[in-house]
Amino acid sequence: MERISLTIEKNLLKEVDEIINKERISRSEFIRRALEYYVKKYDWLSRIESKIGEITVIYNSKAVEDIVKLESQYKDIVIISLEIPFEGKIIRMIAIKGQRDRIIEFTNKLKGISSVELAQLTTISIE
């Protein structure tokens, strides 16, 4: 195994430590699992051409206009969008269908909106 050094924000480290205490694993094991998950997901996304899925977005009210505008720019892949207010934040579930590259591009643009805390893509293959 190789050894690496990692710098993360204090808040994120606190959250990681809470999880590893509950899971009873080391920081190294936690990071190893997270990296493996990310690599597998990236590999899977790169192999499938056409997809159907859902993007979960968590944000505050400042992002509403930007998200609605972005959805209209990607209306070729956005099927429907559902917005749920929850504990001072907004959870939006966006059903999507289309080409992998277009879906990934849309998801990345959602992540780039400053008031978006999370944009998580979940997909299945149409093959």
Curated annotation (Swiss-Prot):
It holds the Pfam family NikR_C. One of its GO terms (biological process) is regulation of DNA-templated transcription. Transmembrane segments: none annotated. It comes from the Archaea. The keyword rRNA-binding does not apply. The keyword Metal-binding does not apply. CDD domains: RHH_NikR_HicB-like (cd22231). Keywords: DNA-binding, Transcription, Transcription regulation. SUPFAM superfamilies: ACT-like, Ribbon-helix-helix. InterPro entries: Acetolactate_synth/TF_NikR_C, ACT-like_dom_sf, Arc_rbn_hlx_hlx, CopG, CopG/NikR_regulator, Ribbon_hlx_hlx, TF_NikR_Ni-bd_C. Signal peptide: none annotated. Belongs to the transcriptional regulatory CopG/NikR family. PANTHER family: NICKEL-RESPONSIVE REGULATOR. This is Uncharacterized transcriptional regulator MJ0080. It comes from Methanocaldococcus jannaschii (strain ATCC 43067 / DSM 2661 / JAL-1 / JCM 10045 / NBRC 100440).
